[in-house]
């Protein structure tokens, strides 16, 4: 398999998880599309390693591998196909590598929303630093933190909800009821903003819409329908 084929495979895997992007990326400048999907695909690889599956050990090993890979990117070396696009970007890859142990440790539920956000703050700050370089403009660490909380919820379901939310919903709640309550909290408190790079605004808007629909009863991983995606992405792109 060639490097180009391997890269296309990882990008394709991300697109399978986020089919909305085929509609939404029409609002992303053409010159930013390749870097956008590669960077989003890398983040998906990291969060799935941290929060995917029932056994955390394979994911911890994968995050350890990624820490070494990102250190290599800062020194001009790469092994992973996503590095074909991303390694040449002069972003703070070392900062992201250093934050991966925090991501690995974030599988356990936090006590409250504030604690959940604080637990992910180092990885959110690292992502924000890379966002600013990839998208050539200032990004917001609070928005990166909300993205991480949303991804954690979509991957872990009930297990992602802080203990405070579980106590509020009580015993005997329907399956994924705790997760739906947490999704409602996140979607209501995550305020859309007009600043930040356009690809990030669009992705955040789609995540908020997924959360809103899940809170209202949709399956947790169901994509946003195409017509709704078009409307949501257009509004986010306008700023």
Which role does the model predict for each range below?
Residues 1-68, 72-85, 96-101, 120-129, ...:
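Catalytic cores of Mg2+-dependent Asp-rich isoprenoid enzymes
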Residues 90-93:
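Long, charge-dense
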Residues 101-113:
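Acidic/His metal-coordination segments adjacent to aromatic residues that form catalytic metal sites
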Residues 114, 137-142:
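Short pre-active-site segment immediately N-terminal to the catalytic Zn-binding motif
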Residues 152-154:
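Conserved active-site beta-strand-loop modules that form the wall/rim of enzyme catalytic pockets
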């Amino acid at each position: 398999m060639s490097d180009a084929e391997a890269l296309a495979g990882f990008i394709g895997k991300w697109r399978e998880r986020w089919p909305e992007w085929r509609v939404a990326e029409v609002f992303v400048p053409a010159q930013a599309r390749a870097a956008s999907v590669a960077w989003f695909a890398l983040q998906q690889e990291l969060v799935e390693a941290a929060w995917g599956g029932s056994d955390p050990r394979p994911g911890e090993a994968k995050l350890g591998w990624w820490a070494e890979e990102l250190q290599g990117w800062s020194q001009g070396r790469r092994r992973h196909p996503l590095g074909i696009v991303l390694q040449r970007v002069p972003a703070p890859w070392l900062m992201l590598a250093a934050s991966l142990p925090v991501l690995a440790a974030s599988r356990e539920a936090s006590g409250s929303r504030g604690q959940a956000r604080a637990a992910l703050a180092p990885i959110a700050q690292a992502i924000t630093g890379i966002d600013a370089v990839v998208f050539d403009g200032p990004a917001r660490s609070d928005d990166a933190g909300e993205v991480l909380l949303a991804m954690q919820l979509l991957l872990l379901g009930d297990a992602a909800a802080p203990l405070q939310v579980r106590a509020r919903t009580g015993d005997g709640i329907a399956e994924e009821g705790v997760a739906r309550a947490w999704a409602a909290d996140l979607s209501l408190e995550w305020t859309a903003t007009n600043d930040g790079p356009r690809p990030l605004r669009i992705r955040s808007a789609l995540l908020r819409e997924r959360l809103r629909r899940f809170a209202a009863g949709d399956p947790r991983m169901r994509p946003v329908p195409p017509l709704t995606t078009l409307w949501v992405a257009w509004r986010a792109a306008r700023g």
